[in-house]
Amino acid sequence: MSCTIYDKTKPITLQTRMDNYVKTTFLQHALRIILGSFMVLAAIGHLTFQREEFQAQVPTWIPLSKDLVVLLSGIVEFALGIGMLFWRKRRVLVGIALGVFFILIFPGNVAQYTNSIDAFGLDTDRARLIRLFFQPVLVLWALWSTGAVKAFKQRSTL
């Protein structure tokens, strides 16, 4: 990823700032491993035994087959999970990508709530509504555990 950001007097590249190693704490590391493992497990569910439940969450306005959407999102989840677990050099970019992914799949959670779809143990409107509020937590978890928040702060001080 390479784009130029102009900071009043001199250009800096986003690539240089985001790809540099950002030191994280033990807690961030542990939570990144947990989230990466969760993503790999979710991907396995998408690709195998939970495919039908995930298909039920795909909004009807998406112009692709529900099965294709579930398979593609499972592949993306697997790649992001592996990236969270092993791609240290690009950890910040993987965290940003995972945060964006969580935002992109949010309409599926909204569809589950608005259409009262029972899946993954969410069998009441209250449970489905609470799940909606968990999505921002996942976005922040991805960004914080990978050091992306710190990288953004460092970038803003230039």
Language model region names:
Residues 2-158:
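Membrane-interface extramembranous regions
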